Amino acid sequence: MRAYNDLIVALKQCGALAVCDGFYVIGADEQAFTRNLVGDIYNLTAVNAPTYAADNYVAGNGTTSYYDTGANPTTMVSPKFVQDSAHLGIWSLTNNNNAGALSYDAGNANTFIARTAATSGGVTFRVNRTGSALATLPGYPGHIVVSRSASDLFKIWGNGTDIGGATTASTGVSNQTLRISDASGSLHGVNQIRAMHFGSHMTLAQAAAVNAALRAYASAIGAP
């Protein structure tokens, strides 16, 4: 419990929790993972029994299982996640792919983080747009954040560093809930995920602080 509380304190102190609509992290049981650290809203629902490994990770089966936040950007009340200020972040433990295809680790149709099969550490991502961009995260697996700060600018932060971005314009939020191990209900994931968060634009400094806080938490709970 102390490690959990220390994590929340660290996330508040760096300002990261204030920009989030949802923040989820692995714990001793699945119920702890499904609780939103931001508040009692958008708690996760397990769909078709995704894998839950206590104090370690969750994973989809690549076909039907995932966690649903219930947060639809078009219907959320006073959302921080909006068209031209939005982020999605995950902490992934694996560098594998979905049988040679993409592993969609989190998101929905217009905002997602997926793992490419072509390159070790390769990431395919988008933030409130219909086209995707590519980046490579040295030292992957790890913590990755895709964040849009303007209508014509979005960046990708990897393990607390700047690893790329694009100037492609936003096209709108998706009328779909944000999910873990899935994006849009037909794009599925298999990788091991230890944390996921989403909200308004997250700065590089905040992403670096989240990365450090998550790693300190994992060490404190004895995560493998």
Regions found by a protein language model. Give the residues of each.
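Polar, enzyme-active/binding microenvironments
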Residues: M1-P224
